[in-house]
Amino acid sequence: RMRPVPETGNELPPLLSGGLTYPEGEKILCKKRERGTRITCSPGSNTELFTEMKGNKRFIFRLCAAAALFLNLFPLQAGECTLMSYNVKNGTGMDGRRDYDRTARVIAEEKPDVVALQELDQGTIRSGGRDTLQELAARTTLTGTYAKAIDYSGGSYGVGILSREKPLRVKRIPLPGREEARVLLMAEFRDYWFCVTHLSLTREDSSASIDMIAALAAKCSKPFFIAGDFNLTPDSEPITRMKKYFILLSDPAQKTFPAGHPKECIDYIWMYRGKKTEAFHVKERRVIEAPAASDHRPVKVTVSY
């Protein structure tokens, strides 16, 4: 279930495809003949259908009727995706007790397609050598992808993604953090990119990180989502800067921290502007009522397209 990513990363490799992608259907190429019409089906097909007729009107009528029948039998399905962000504090709750089952239940009950996780230990002494992301992946039956931010306590500490769909590829991008090194984890899926980060407590580093993330998003031809613990309130200058590049999908009026009695919102889910945003609609957005499993409450957004 684990997909480790490279320790460092610079330039993203070129994307294979752009926009929202779906399995490509076979093209129908029509070529006129003297006494009728020839239809060649391609790619991957050697079948040729010859229709002999006096004119093209009958052929066009039959083609339209066949298309209408196909769409009636196999209508185009709109997509829907549920995104989450959760600072899990390494599976440790407000009671100071580490309980992976409790954390996993909070996630599983929401039935997300993809989850951005922050504050994950991997093989540290304080976690008894256990891998927090792997523990949660096993309990939620989701695929886990991890990115180290720092070496810590005999292991590492970082961020991760849980997803129903196995990522096509992933990338680890170091971000500035003078008090603690930060990281961006990018995962490409069939229809979109989904990313997670946990930004610095230093405003200058946060602003620099936002500019870096926006530059990376601009290179991606698919819709680009990013979620995480930004350590920033909605009225902060870096969040205002973020809004220049990204659309805020989650509700900043709903508080996320501290989990017991939330007083501020510092956890967000965003979508990069200009990446087919007109096709996406927010169906649901809320902060999940989870006061005990971590010191943050998780954020959930469901989008349709």
Predicted regions and their residues:
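Polybasic, lysine-rich low-complexity intrinsically disordered segments
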Residues: T8-N10, K27-I28, K32
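Metal-dependent phosphoester-hydrolase catalytic domains
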Residues: R172-P174, R203-S207, A215-F225, N231-Y305
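N-terminal, active-site-proximal structural segment of metallo-dependent hydrolase catalytic domains
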Residues: K31, E52-K54, F59-R62, F70, ...
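Intrinsically disordered, low-complexity segments enriched in serine/proline and basic residues
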Residues: P4-P6, P13-S17, S42-S45, F50, ...
